[in-house]
């Protein structure tokens, strides 16, 4: 294929690339992957067979579903083949396991539904305003309020968002705990912005002698369940944070601009003992114009921050190091994990 023809095909594909994740969202909501999984390993089914397990009275359901599955198969999301009788059948690929509940009942599927929910999709129509108007947040342009304010007013979206974040956070923490051993030897760990304590629960399950403090806004920790070894404390992290041997923050700093991050890190510095440390988990922005899948994932995460978080952004390792040094920390250590995520330590001494 000549270069011009190849470029034209890629250009045409780009026009409709947004359809792919929406097709994925549809089969997740229809439980197609679960239906294929229950059929057994390496089993392939026709769309007509699949819809027998979907609650619908639509006589054209099989035909319509086949059109969705055909697109996903063309992107190798599903396997596909033609039987001797001429029927098209579909099965699971290795990729599909990440969208099926694992041994802990979590997967990437809820995040697909969250990111492509109609609420968040509406924000992208205002992405250009973040360039044209100073201080413009696409989400606020779309709804006239911040994402946090909106989630309070829309209980349906709040439930969808929380489900997506819970599963994604659990998967991330599982990888962190497999790769990072810096919780060893700590007596007390403070999780700043810890929500209802899910991350601390996972950490303490691996380090049972560790005591945990889950710190978040009062209305958040008010609904937090009780965990052995975990104390819930409400407050404002931009005012002060509880003291501990180490302070843990997962996907917190990327929500805020440099000024707010510096305020928070200084509060952490003040709360730590002489040899204490801050442990953060964040996406690490590549410092060059990389085109590999992991880098594209982080660039996508950064654009989501541009659309949904006022002042939020992904940062390079150097950016985080500069913030840490300005806040008073002397040493920065990086522990790369999977999919562009790193654990980074900021040491007080």
UniProtKB/Swiss-Prot annotation:
S-adenosyl-L-homocysteine binds at residues 193, 216, 236-237, 249-250. GO terms for biological process: methylation; phenylpropanoid biosynthetic process; response to wounding. The active site is at residues 254, 282, 314. The keyword Oxidoreductase does not apply. Induction: Transiently induced after wounding. Its EC number is 2.1.1.330. Keywords: Methyltransferase, S-adenosyl-L-methionine, Transferase. Pathway: Aromatic compound metabolism; phenylpropanoid biosynthesis. It is an enzyme of class 2 (transferase). It comes from the Eukaryota. Belongs to the class I-like SAM-binding methyltransferase superfamily. Cation-independent O-methyltransferase family. COMT subfamily. This is Desmethyl-yatein O-methyltransferase. The gene is OMT1.
